[in-house]
């Protein structure tokens, strides 16, 4: 209820709302964003407040620019020429809300909360930000951790249909509408850039990992965009590790050099840990042989030719160790730690 109260306060008096958050950020941000926002998203349509944000559904295909413009004309400030001003768009399809799974259009709490975080901690003008939900449907109760029948709830206002998916060449299921010459994501990204200019940040948020990685690779070179779950979390994780090394060795003048000599175990193989592992290997210079990543099947491994292994997608394959682990239980975390004796353990799993 504290979450709902703060959302109502924002609706009635945005200035007072942000002044309140700025007065007690350490106390209030966990209510506005994680961890409280997860429960709020599970009940989003039933909470007594008027949420802000723009909903763009597959039914808007071909008219996405008009939908964004209608929202922008009504909600965003204008420049001297009457053009709406937007610094940042955080958009999600609700496909993987935190560790809770597919919450569909009820995932709007995440873009709203993330932009509030950027205002309080990053100085973004809240009047020039835009939370967006890409409504591509929602899976049934099997698609979320609490087994909630969100899609069939009387108060659910999103598209009451299952997500249309196909198996991509890499063997994973992806949202069909996001790929190909008529990509819905491509139409959205292009429309946003045409309306708000190339300097408007377009941030992917809480997409399913199977979509998050290929979409980031597709658009990162074409738009001002990034994926917070992959890149943002990875940056913070590596910074935390370097900070830990500095605390442990106050006189160290080469933190990266110290990190490069350590063994690292990533428990969990979602967007956060895969992004962190790749950043550690590619940018921090940690040898790939010193990095282990686990998924639900244990330590991720691949054969020498890459044809076999227990990886689930190309991203997991990229951080897999070569050769099937032997001599210990590769599915048991304690056994893995005893055998490999990592210097650093980073956990990012939906449920431990």
Protein language model regions, located:
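A short, small-residue-rich loop immediately preceding and capping a beta-strand
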Residues: 262-268
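Metallocofactor- and cofactor-centric catalytic cores in central/energy metabolism, strongly enriched
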Residues: 1-261, 281-283, 287, 311-314, ...
């Amino acid at each position: 209820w504290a979450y709902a109260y703060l959302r109502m306060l924002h609706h009635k008096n945005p200035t007072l709302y942000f002044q309140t958050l700025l007065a007690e950020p350490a106390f209030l941000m966990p209510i506005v964003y994680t961890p409280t926002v997860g429960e709020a998203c599970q009940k989003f349509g039933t909470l007594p407040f008027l949420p802000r944000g723009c909903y763009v559904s597959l039914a808007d295909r071909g008219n996405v620019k008009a939908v964004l413009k209608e929202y922008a004309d009504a909600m965003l400030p204008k420049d001297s020429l009457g053009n709406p001003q937007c610094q940042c768009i955080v958009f999600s399809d609700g496909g993987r809300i935190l560790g809770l799974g597919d919450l569909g259009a009820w995932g709007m709490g995440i873009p709203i909360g993330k932009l509030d975080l950027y205002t309080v901690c990053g100085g973004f003008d809240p009047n020039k930000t835009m939370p967006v939900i890409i409504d591509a449907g929602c899976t049934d109760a099997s698609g979320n951790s609490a087994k909630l029948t969100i899609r069939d709830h009387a108060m659910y206002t999103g598209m009451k249909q299952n997500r249309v998916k196909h198996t991509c060449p890499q063997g994973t299921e992806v949202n069909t509408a996001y790929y190909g010459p008529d990509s819905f994501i491509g139409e959205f990204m292009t429309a946003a850039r045409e309306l708000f200019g190339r300097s408007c940040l377009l941030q992917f948020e809480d997409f399913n990992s199977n979509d998050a990685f290929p979409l980031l690779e597709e658009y990162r070179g074409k738009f001002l965009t990034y994926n917070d779950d992959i890149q943002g979390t990875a940056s913070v994780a590596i910074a935390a590790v370097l900070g830990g090394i500095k605390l442990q060795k106050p006189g160290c003048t080469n933190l990266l050099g110290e990190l490069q000599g350590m063994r690292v175990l990533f428990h969990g193989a979602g967007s956060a840990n895969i992004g962190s592992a790749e950043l550690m290997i590619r940018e921090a210079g940690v040898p790939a042989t010193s990095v282990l990543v686990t998924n639900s099947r244990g330590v991720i491994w691949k054969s020498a030719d890459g044809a076999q292994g227990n990886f689930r997608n190309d991203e997991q394959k990229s951080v897999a160790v070569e050769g099937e682990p032997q001599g210990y239980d590769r599915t048991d975390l304690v056994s893995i730690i005893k055998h490999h004796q990592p210097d650093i353990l980073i956990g990012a799993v939906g449920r431990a």
